[in-house]
Every structure is written in C-alpha cells, then in structure tokens.
Swiss-Prot record:
Name of protein: Small ribosomal subunit protein uS4c
GO biological process, alphabetically ordered: ribosomal small subunit biogenesis; translation
Compartment annotation: Plastid, Chloroplast
One GO term describing the cellular component: small ribosomal subunit
Keyword Transport: no
The encoding gene: rps4
Subunit relationships: Part of the 30S ribosomal subunit. Contacts protein S5. The interaction surface between S4 and S5 is involved in control of translational fidelity.
Upper taxonomic lineage: Eukaryota, Viridiplantae, Chlorophyta, Mamiellophyceae, Mamiellales
Main location: plastid
Amino acid sequence: MARYRGPRVKIVRRLGELPGLTTKIPNRNYPAGQHGPSSGMTKMSQYRVRLQEKQKLRYNYGVSEKQLLSYVRRARRMKGPTGELLLQMLEMRLDAVVYRLGFAPTIRAARQYVSHGLVTVNGQAVTIPSYQCSVGEVIKSNSAPIVEHAKTFGGVVPSHLSVDKNNATGKVERNVTRSQIGLTVNELLIIEFYSRK
C-alpha cells in the first residue's frame, strides 16, 4: 500500500495530535463517523491500543507499513533500547530533519521538497526522503518557498539541530534523544505490536 492520501483531519480526530501530518486543527474532539461521539464509551482492547500507537507513528512520519517494519527490524539488531532507536531512525530521516528545521510546515511538505530536489545535503542534491542524516551534515536550500518559510518559522528548533534562518541552512549537531521528539507516542507498545512479526 502506498502513502496515505486521504483526509488528514479525520486521522487527527481518531489518533490525536500529529504535528508532522497536518497543521489543521479539528473542530470536534471525537473520532469521525456515525458512532464517533459515542465510541468513547467502549473499552479498547490491548491490540487496538498497540495498533493506534503504531498508526500514530506511521501517519506522522508518512511511512508505509513495510518501511516501518523494516525500521523496527533494524532497530532490534542495534544495541540499545529498541523503541528509542526506532524513533531516532525515524527522526533522522531527511524529510523529518527538514521539517524540524522549520523549512516546511509538515513532514509531507518536506518530503515533497526533498523529492523535487530542492534540498541539498553537504552540497549534494538528495532526492530520497528516507535518507538517514548523520551528525555533522549540513542541510541547505535555495528554493524561494523554503527560504520564506524558514524566515517566518516561529516554532522551536530541537537542540540536536542548529539553523540559520536567513540562509535556510541547518546542521545536525548530534543524534536526537527521546526527550527532543515532539510526538506523544509510547514506543514500547509499538515494539510489542511488532514482536510477533
């Protein structure tokens, strides 16, 4: 299955705030659908809780099920806490770094900027949104929309990144830690969800 292209506010209403998916804010605070307002009365199963946590991660970072499973398997092979390593790998993707630097309003927009060749890494054009950024790499763009958004960006840039808003240039200073990730998700439930795969 390809990336999700459907209504984004519906997903936000169901799963909660996803800053990488959309900047829109839903008018209603209950899930969409015929049984939306009354669905809060039912007890959520253990499977549903884990599935929703996984879906939060998928929709926020715009990755497919196959990609997320690949990231989980790669995180399992690495030394350290699997959940934190998974989030670190997702957060160090080029599209996520471009979004965190304030060059794009959402990760989806950052993905499009990268795939259209508007972003360079260490002076080389990179058109792969899943490119894993490493410490010391410089991300730059000369595109007018990106430079304009970077200048007007009012959000907080995480401390593992440094940014020059006037030149639309950013640098990865160090690896991201769990406290610097702006997504409220329980990564242990995601690892438990994938424990049988």
